[in-house]
């Protein structure tokens, strides 16, 4: 274990990627950290209110940040251009918020996406959780109530095209480990509903 840098701020569950010898990361404020020199540089802020637990993908010198949530869950996204130091809204939307989804980037433009919150259920929960006593009721509900995504699908980052590769109620997870080994795909634990974690490790063979 090696400490690469000490920062006077904290960032949790935002966007990030490695590009060349640098780490680019942020939540609302954006930063670029040089792994060789230790230099930290402020970059252009995320253009709207910060979002947590979205999907970050590096494609053609741009970081795509999809979905995520704050006081509501989103299906749109923004891309950051490293050369121009600016953000632009992405032309397409993903099928659901991808809040808490797991991903595997197969190649430059194709990403596997597993699980993720249901946008409508999340947005309603933000309202309902303001009511006294509802929190206990919310966390006691069964997983069927939350309607998390049961699909594994392939997203083309370039044009937003979606190909559904599989559907199973056991895929309805958030925060799962998702690993590709040869032609096998391993799904490791993850939450099956808020506050409850699945114990299983699933093996999906020859998904593509």
Please annotate each region the language model reported.
Residues 1-208:
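Kelch-like beta-propeller repeat domains
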């Amino acid at each position: 274990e090696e400490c690469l840098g000490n920062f006077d701020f904290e960032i949790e569950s935002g966007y990030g990627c490695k590009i060349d010898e640098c780490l680019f990361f942020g939540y609302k404020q954006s930063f670029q950290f040089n792994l060789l020199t230790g230099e930290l540089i402020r970059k252009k802020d995320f253009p709207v209110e910060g979002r947590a637990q979205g999907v970050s993908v590096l494609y053609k010198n741009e970081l795509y940040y999809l979905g995520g949530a704050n006081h509501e869950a989103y299906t749109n996204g923004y891309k950051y251009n490293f050369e121009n130091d600016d953000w632009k809204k992405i032309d397409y939307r993903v099928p659901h918020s991808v809040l808490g989804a797991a991903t595997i980037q197969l190649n430059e433009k194709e990403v596997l996406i597993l699980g993720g919150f249901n946008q409508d259920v999340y947005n309603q929960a933000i309202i309902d959780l303001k009511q006294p006593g509802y929190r206990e009721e919310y966390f006691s509900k069964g997983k069927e109530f939350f309607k998390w995504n049961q699909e594994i699908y392939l997203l083309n980052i370039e044009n937003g095209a979606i190909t559904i590769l599989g559907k199973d109620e056991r895929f309805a997870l958030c925060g799962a480990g998702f690993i590709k080994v040869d032609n096998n795909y391993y799904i490791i634990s993850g939450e099956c509903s808020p506050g409850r974690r699945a114990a299983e490790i699933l093996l999906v063979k020859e998904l593509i």
